[in-house]
Amino acid sequence: MDRAADHGVDALIAADPGVLGYASQRHPQLTLHLSVQGSATNASALAFYAQHYNIRRAVLPRVLSLAQVRQVAANSTVPIEVFAFGSLCIMAEGRCHLSSYITGESPNLCGVCSPAKAVRWSEDAEGLSARLSEVLIDRYSADEPAGYPTLCKGRFLVGGKRFHALEEPTSLDTLDLLPELAAMGVEAVKIEGRQRSPAYVEQVTQVWRAALDAHRLAPERFAVKDQWRQVLAGLSEGSQTTLGAYHRSWQ
C-alpha cells in the first residue's frame, strides 16, 4: 500500500478494516474504494465506512436485487459501483467458507475461490473431470460446456440424483439493465476479471466500452446489439448468462 501511494495510483480497493484504517490515516490523499468483500448492503453500512475510512466509492455485493440497489443508491452519499459481467456468486460475499473448506485457503486472504494450484483437469473414457484439491467437482461429457471448478457450482449426488445442488456454471450479464442502472444513479460498473486471461478481459471490456458509449450518446435509443451478445455468450461460464439476483419477479 505504501508503494502504491508512492507511485501515485488513482485509487485503492480494500475490505479489511485494518487496511482501510491504515490507508486513510497514513495516506489521507489516497482515494479509497470499498471492495465487494466488505459485504456492505445498505446505506447505513456505507455511511459507517465513509465516516471512519473516508471511502469514495463502494462495490455492492451481487446478492442485491435492482430494487435494493436503487434504494441504496438513493439513500447513500457514497457513489455506487455494481457488478456488470463475469462470474456470479450466490453467497454473502466476504463471508463464504466453502472454498476454504476444500482448499484450506480463504478467498478473502488469497483472492480467489479456486486457486489455480488446486485445480486439476483430467480426461478419460467417462469424460472431462474437474477437481479442486483432488475433490471431484464435476464431470462433463464431450458435448457439454465445462465451467471453472468452484465448489458452489459443482454437480453432486444428492438423494440419489446428480445435479447442480447450489448453482449451475453461468455468468452474470447485465447489458440489458444498463439504462436502469444509469437511471438509478449507479456511478460505475464492474467487470469481474479475477483469474481471467488478457484475451478475456480485452473482449469483455471492448463490448462494455461500446455499450456505455452508445448509451451515453443516445440513452433513449439504446439497444443491445446481437454482436455484443454473441461475444459475451462465448466468454460465459457454461456458455450461459443470467441477470442473477438483479431480477426478482416478486420485487
Listing of model-derived features with the role each one plays in the protein:
Residues 42-46:
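Short, glycine/polar-rich helix-capping loops at beta-to-alpha or helix-loop-helix junctions
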Residues 1-40, 59, 63, 67-188, ...:
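Active-site pocket-lining/capping segments in soluble small-molecule metabolic enzymes
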Residues 52-55, 82:
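A cross-taxonomic marker for long C-terminal extensions/tails that follow the last structured domain
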